[in-house]
């Protein structure tokens, strides 16, 4: 059975999340936030503890029907639907990550992942995916976060980790906080520079992708640089 610890000092999971971040919360607290309220017999933390104690693992959530979830947790249909929707969303996120690590990458796959990761950032972030000879990700590395004095990174910073990982190829991604994905003249110059630097070391630059929260631009798909 799933092991649960009930701690009276953790009675405010939402406040703890705001102070410490979601990763600091227990499964019990995270579930309590989703449940929002308890039922007639149990406080919300007691209810989440009770529900988790009847599972062998968190994966059991996905196997449960709406009716089973309602019956076990003593919650209404709306709350059960919300929990099932969250579980399905998490499953889809994990499916994207698995696709990226297990199979050949396409610009669309990378763009979808990075639109979710970088689309809401207020500063420019430059991320590089380092790949092996089967196009599997060796490392995903944030190389640079923009400042008012500087945007994008130098090729040597990108290539340092390529050599460290013994990568065969790489994909460069950065976001445009403005939401406009059209590449600037600096983006073109940077792409030419990193592509040339990669070629000098025998590394393949597969693509440079610009993302916003809802769209992307692939230099491989839309420019003549590749």
Swiss-Prot record:
Cysteine disulfide partners in this protein: none
Keywords: Hydrolase, Metal-binding, Metalloprotease, Protease, Zinc
SUPFAM superfamilies: RuvA domain 2-like (SSF47781)
Domain MPN: 103-225
Keyword Protease among UniProt keywords: yes
Database matches in InterPro entries: MPN (IPR037518), RadC_JAB (IPR025657), RuvA_2-like (IPR010994), UPF0758 (IPR001405), UPF0758_CS (IPR020891), UPF0758_N (IPR046778)
Pfam families, alphabetized: RadC, UPF0758_N
Binding site residues for Zn(2+): 174, 176, 187
A single GO molecular function term of this UniProt record: metal ion binding
Keyword rRNA-binding: no
Single biological process term from Gene Ontology: proteolysis
Motif stretch (JAMM motif): 174-187
Domain of life: Bacteria
Assigned protein family: Belongs to the UPF0758 family.
Database matches in PANTHER family: DNA REPAIR PROTEIN RADC (PTHR30471), UPF0758 PROTEIN YEES-RELATED (PTHR30471:SF3)
Protein name according to UniProt: UPF0758 protein M6_Spy0838
The organism's taxonomic lineage, starting at the top: Bacteria, Bacillati, Bacillota, Bacilli, Lactobacillales
